[in-house]
Structure formats: C-alpha cells, structure tokens
C-alpha cells in the first residue's frame, strides 16, 4: 500500500499495521522482536520521536528516521466547548487542513476522525462538502488524529484514554477504502491502542453499495452507519446527489447483504431539516422502509447544525422532532434523538476548516 501522498517523502509509521512493521523490520535486517519494541513505544508509551525509544540501537533509530516520520499533523486551532467537546484543526505536510472532534461521553472519550481533505459527495446541507475533495487522508494521518487527541490528555496529566472512534468526519470513508481499513486494523490491534471493534463506527452515504458488501467480509466486528436522511429517492436525491447513481433499492440490497452476512445491526443517521424531511408522513415512509429489517436496525435522529452557506435549511423544531420520533416508535422502530455536543463552538462538521481557509485567503488578498 502506498502510504504517502504528500510533499513529505517519508510516510508516517502510524500507517503500518503491526504485521507490516514486522515485515519492514525484517527486510531491513532487524529481528522481529525489534519491531514489537517499536510498536510498544508508539502505542503503549506514546513517544513523540524515535530517539526516545531507548532500548533500540542508534543504527536502528537511523533506519527508522530515514524511512518514516512519526506524526505528520500540525495543530492549528483548538476550540473547547463548555460541555467538554474539543474540536481540532490540523494541518498536513502539504498545508491542507482537516478537522477532528473529541466528544466526552458517559462511556468514555470518543473521537470523530476525518478521512478526506474535502468531500465530493455533494450533500446539499453539509458544511464538509462546501470545499471539494483535494485528496485522501492516508492511514497514518488518520491514526495521527487519534494520537494527537490522546497526547492532549497525556500532556495534561489526565488519566483518560480514547476508547471509542467514529469515522464520521470530513469525507466519505468508503471512497478511501484501503487507507480506512489499514487505519481500523491499527487502532483495533490488541497490542496497541486496543480500541475494541464494537467501539468503532464507520459511516457511509452509500455512494458505492458494492463497498458495503466488501466491508461485510473484512472479518471485523466494527459498527456500520448509513447516512440516510430521506426514505424515498426523490427526496434523498434533492438532499444527496449520490442517490442518482445509488438509489435506495441498490443501497438497501447491499445493506441486506451486509446484515445477512454479519448478523450485525446497522444504524441509520437521519438529519432533521425543517420543512424538508421532518413531517409525520415522511416519518411513516421511513418506518415502512425500516420495518422489514427492524431487528438489525437503529435510527438516529440528528438535530441539524445550521451552516452559513446553506441558508435554505433550518433545524427541525423540538415539536416536529418529537412527532417524527413518535411515529417511528409507534411502528416499533428502534430510534433515538442524538445528544448534541459542542453547540457553542463550530459544531457542524467542516465548518471550522472552511472558516480557517477563508481567513487564510483574506490575508493573502
């Protein structure tokens, strides 16, 4: 796998799985246990440089420095919310920027990672797609987001660790499938960060139903979420243009294949847009769509975070959201209204990045 696609000629070592690191070490004249030592320094001791790996020879450290960098991300902006949510803006070696979000949950620290610089999916309500995709984020750069968030707590002497990960940041994860899978295997490794598969969720808009089928055979018990947002093709196409090429019939054929293959539940994300997709009639359509597969389904109703560039959309009222929820519950649909995080900072995914890029352009003008 080609890990590096930036101006930095060396890839991040975080992009290697443990088996890949062992293979590299042996190819470079080192014993297998040396790679295991490096892995331990990276993920258990969480050092910030190869020079800190005190049980390695100077020759081996030189080899590591010649072949890899550690963390390729530079922290640009940090926004902290009153509820404990932290939003980070990171710069990559080629000066493009990505967002990462830490959310404090009752069950631990959850991090939302970004998989692409910009997004081409064209969802009309989303801040992430305002700036189009420039490139994929490499596996090492995705892992680095987790490592820098963990460093944030380590440096403050806080005995807390990242325990949950959601792949719901900027970009479409299944459009960066190879790097996504390497990232998942790195963070799920029991000898490393050891983030349990059932504590990891990957979200897709379903633009490539075939990838959902492929994901079913990865032999990982990672949670799958579908960005649905509408129960019929006409409405969904108006909100998500990818529906033209991946209509609901194709999407749900792939979802049914996934659930039959894995026997794992699928979460459906549904953003509540006032006057667009929040009527009781639409709720009944959604219930009718989910009901045949309700045993392995869960609907997540999401309050909309307004985006300046998308002024036509407003958040559903609490009353309309409650009525929508009630229709689903009366139909026996497993559902919840998502708890909000970070409402006093740039809450919408992609908003912080968009603002910073505008600031940078204004400085150059």
Curated annotation (Swiss-Prot):
Subcellular location: Cytoplasm
Intrachain S-S bonds: 112-349
Enzyme Commission number, as recorded: 2.1.1.192
Binding site for S-adenosyl-L-methionine: 171-172, 203, 227-229, 305
Residues at which [4Fe-4S] cluster binds: 119, 123, 126
Record's cofactor remark: Binds 1 [4Fe-4S] cluster. The cluster is coordinated with 3 cysteines and an exchangeable S-adenosyl-L-methionine.
Active site: residue positions: 99, 349
Enzyme class of the recorded protein, top EC level: transferase
Nucleotidyltransferase is among the record's keywords: no
GO biological processes: rRNA base methylation; tRNA methylation
Keyword Mitochondrion in record: no
Other remarks in the entry: Reaction proceeds by a ping-pong mechanism involving intermediate methylation of a conserved cysteine residue.
HAMAP family: RNA_methyltr_RlmN (MF_01849)
Protein name according to UniProt: Probable dual-specificity RNA methyltransferase RlmN
Species the sequence originates in: Lactococcus lactis subsp. cremoris (strain SK11)
